[in-house]
Structure formats: C-alpha cells, structure tokens
C-alpha cells in the first residue's frame, strides 16, 4: 500500500498503524482485524491463539540470552469507537480510516482516528516483527469490545496467559503512567408509566451546549448534566402548577456526562404554559450563572405550541420520574482526602429515556475500593425500592488497586529518566481499564498502563502526535531490554 506517514522511526511502526487503520474494526466488528493478526503470526512462525470472540494472543520466545527472564505481557484492544461528522460519508462496517497527516499530527478525515487503541496494535506488531530487539518471552494480548464494556478482556481465558508482568498500551498521555483504576457497573432503573389524553399548549425545553465528557475521568470537573438540569426545572414547575410530562429524553451512553436533554410538557392553555415558561427562564438564568466558569456553553430554549393533543404521563408516573432524578446520586461522592484528593466514588446519570409505557434511567457508578462500590450499589437498590423502580446491575468490572511495590513501574521510571531527563508522572484514574480484569484473574500481576499522547479520543477530532509515538516506542524498547537483562 502507499503509506502516508513518512519521516518517523521506526517506519514499520507507522506502516503497521496504517495497515491496521485500513481494516474496519468498530466494536462488534473485529473479525477482520482479528484474522489479520492470526495471519501475521502464522506468516512469522509465531504461536497464536484466537478465541470465539476474536481475542488473539501471539507468543514470541525470548531473544538470545533472555531465556530466563520472566515473561512479559503486552496488551491493548483492537476495537475502536466509531463516530463521524454529520457531513462525512463513511461506512465504518466497510470503510477503512482515511488518515490525514499535517504538521506532525495524525488525524482522520472527519471520523474518529482509532489511535485508541490502534497504536497499541501497531506497537505490538512492530515488536513481534523485529528480531533485533532484546526482550523477554512475550505474550501479546489483543482484546475485543473494550469500548463497549471490556467484553473481550472479561471473556478471555486467562489460563492462556503465563506472564505476571503486564504492560497495557491503552494510556493516552506521554510521560504519564497509570498504576490503578476504578471499577464500575451499569445500573438501569425502569418503571412502567401510565398515559392519559391531554389537550392544550405544549412547553418544550431543549438543553444543549454542555461540554459533557467521560463519566469517570471528567466527573470531578463540575460540568453540567443535562438530565439533572432538566429535572431541576421540571421539579420547580411541578411545585408551581400541574404540568403533565409528555416526554423526557437525554443522553445515549451511561458512561458519558450528558450534554443534551429535551422534554415536552403540556398545560391546559397558553396562559398556563407562558407562566411556566417564565419560571423556567428564571431557573435557566440561575444555571447559566452557576456554570459560567465550568460549563459556559450551556443553553436551554423554551418554546410554546398551542392546540396540542398528546398522550402525557399521569401525575404518579411524572412524580416517580422527577423524584428519581432529583434523589439519585450524581457526581463526586467521595474523595481520598488522605492523599491527593482523587475521586474514590462517583456516579453519573447518563441516560434518561421515556417510551410509550416505560421510563428508563441509566447510571454509571464507579469506585476504586471494592467495599465502597458494593455499599454504593446497596444504596442504589434501596433508592429504587423506595421509588418503585426495578434496578438491574450489569456489565460490572473490577478496579485495579495501587501496588506499593511494582518492579515494572520502577523500570519505567528509571528508563524514562535516563532517556528523556525528566520524571515519569505516576497517576491513578477514576475510570475502568482492562488491567483490573487481568489483575483480578492473574494473582500477583505487576501491571502498568502507558502510551503516547492522544487527544480528543472518541470524537472526530481525535489525533495522535507522531513524534510522541516515536518517542514512546523508544521507551518501550528500552524497558523490554531492561526486563530481558
């Protein structure tokens, strides 16, 4: 193929990235890239394992002289988030990524780039392909469906892995190593609703412009949540009068801070709707002032339409919905005040959806401490019981605890200092990583998560600094050489 990325070393790293990018590999569509990896291994005479969900493990013997060094696992995921600009024609099920190189930065042409986590795949392929590198025995683990709930890592038969040293390649900032993460679970509240025929004037409230963000790593930034703001407005309107809720919909992902929410209410006549609109505008002004620093793009439009005939929730159903949203925990719940104030427990109300006969609320609670996670789940169940909602807990994944003693962390710190003359920053993140699933299954696992600088992942603005990838490869090879000694 004709390669677009030139002038960076090793060239093979960037060639592999381009080859991987040419293969459609959205979550749930990973057979093609998985089969590509199997063929890659067989062409080089490497031992390869592929399971029924298309996870792949490629094993490479130690380089000469490193046969007695402990085996090392390199790990990343092969799926990517698929998102694009509305103006772009791109079919993620059949089309590869159209790469764009400009001023040392790699992006895609109006779509997600997939460097999260395609760069990990390219890094491992480069190491596996180069017989001049000094390294211990390697187990390169390529997992599926990470972006939709760490599914591949959870499903993988961990008995296939002998390594007890793990280098996860799914971190997104050069010069930073992640050494622990939070666990989490998806909680879905559902409640049946009754509807009744109403005539009058509708009041439509439409929230937009919020920054949103990741419900783990961005939960401490005090950004607005459209679902909560909408519930606040409607709660006040319920105190002032008797609106009936026709619909309330906000968010599409439990693990994203909600940016947009739209609700439709119905009043007996135009005068009642206009009076409610004035109250709503006052609350909107308050919220705008409250978010001026943290989320300045917030807007909420208010529109009235007369002569409406709708099927609205009855008062009992409407009260159940608003009470649930006003009482369900959201945001930072607990911090570690003994150390750096990092978030230990949080919750995010990511999705609210009303249908003809049901309301659904999806929450994403997280904790870096298992006992606190379990206690918080109990609280959420109690709240559901009190409010009359059914609660379902699913897609749970474990946290990854900080290790006081970590040889692989020490090696990375020493290597980074000697190569670049500065200190590697060590951090914990309040988000889920595949490391947690591997650490839970592989007793005594010594793990670290690292990677080059990526920006705006999961969006059409996603980018990768090519020089950062170049430097990171240098670091990875040096670490493997040290681990082989």
Predicted ranges, named:
Residues 3-105:
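Acidic/His- and Gly-rich active-site-bordering loop/insert found
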Residues 18-22, 253, 299-312, 348-352, ...:
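A short beta-alpha structural unit
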Residues 66-164, 190, 199-202, 315-318, ...:
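Active-site metal-coordination/substrate-binding segment of hydrolases
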Residues 136-226, 234, 238:
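Fold-level recognition of mixed alpha/beta catalytic cores in primary-metabolism enzymes, strongest
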Residues 196-200, 219-249, 268-346, 380:
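Acidic-enriched catalytic cores of C-N bond-cleaving enzymes acting on peptides and small amides
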Residues 223-248, 402-445:
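Active-site-adjacent substrate-binding region
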């Amino acid at each position: 193929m004709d390669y677009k990325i030139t002038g960076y070393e090793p060239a093979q790293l960037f060639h592999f990235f381009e080859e991987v990018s040419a293969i459609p590999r959205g979550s749930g569509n990973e057979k093609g890239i998985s089969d590509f990896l199997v063929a890659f291994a067989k062409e080089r005479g490497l031992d390869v394992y592929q399971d029924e969900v298309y996870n792949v493990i490629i094993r490479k013997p130690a380089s000469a002289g490193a046969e007695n060094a402990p085996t090392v696992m390199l790990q990343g995921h092969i799926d990517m988030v698929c998102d694009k600009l509305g103006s772009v024609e791109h079919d993620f099920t059949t089309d590869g990524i159209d790469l764009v190189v400009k001023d040392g930065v790699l992006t895609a042409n109006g779509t997600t780039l997939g460097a999260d986590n395609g760069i990990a795949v390219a890094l491992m392929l480069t190491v596996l392909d180069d017989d001049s590198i000094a390294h211990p025995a390697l187990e390169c683990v390529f997992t599926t469906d990470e972006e939709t709930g760490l599914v591949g890592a959870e499903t993988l038969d961990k008995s296939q892995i002998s390594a007890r040293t793990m280098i996860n390649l799914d971190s997104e900032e050069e010069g930073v190593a992640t050494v622990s993460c939070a666990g989490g679970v998806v909680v879905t509240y559902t409640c049946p609703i009754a509807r009744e025929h109403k005539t009058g004037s509708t009041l439509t409230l439409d929230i937009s412009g919020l920054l949103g963000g990741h419900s783990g790593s961005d939960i401490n930034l005090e950004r607005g949540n459209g679902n909560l703001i909408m519930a606040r407005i409607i709660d006040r309107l319920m105190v002032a009068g008797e609106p009936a809720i026709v619909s309330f919909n906000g968010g599409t992902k439990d693990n994203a801070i909600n940016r947009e929410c739209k609700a439709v209410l119905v009043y007996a006549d135009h005068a009642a709707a206009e009076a409610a609109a004035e109250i709503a505008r006052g609350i909107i002004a308050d919220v705008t002032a409250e978010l001026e620093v943290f989320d300045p793009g917030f807007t909420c439009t208010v529109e009235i339409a007369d002569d409406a005939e709708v099927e609205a929730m009855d008062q009992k159903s409407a009260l159940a919905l608003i009470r649930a949203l006003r009482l369900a925990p959201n945001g930072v719940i607990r911090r570690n005040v003994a150390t750096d104030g990092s978030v230990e427990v949080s919750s995010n109300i990511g999705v609210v959806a009303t249908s003809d006969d049901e309301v659904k609320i999806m929450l994403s609670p997280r904790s870096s401490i298992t006992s606190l996670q379990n206690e918080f789940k109990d609280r959420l169940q109690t709240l559901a019981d009190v409010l009359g909602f059914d609660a379902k807990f699913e897609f749970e994944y474990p946290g990854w605890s900080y290790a006081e003693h970590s040889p692989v962390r020490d090696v990375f710190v020493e290597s980074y200092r000697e190569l670049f003359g500065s200190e590697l920053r060590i951090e914990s993140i309040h988000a889920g990583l595949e490391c947690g699933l591997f650490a839970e299954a592989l007793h005594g696992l010594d793990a670290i998560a690292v990677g080059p600088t990526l920006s705006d992942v999961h969006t059409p603005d996603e980018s990768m600094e090519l020089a950062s990838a170049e430097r990171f490869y240098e670091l990875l090879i040096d670490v493997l050489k040290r681990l082989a000694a």
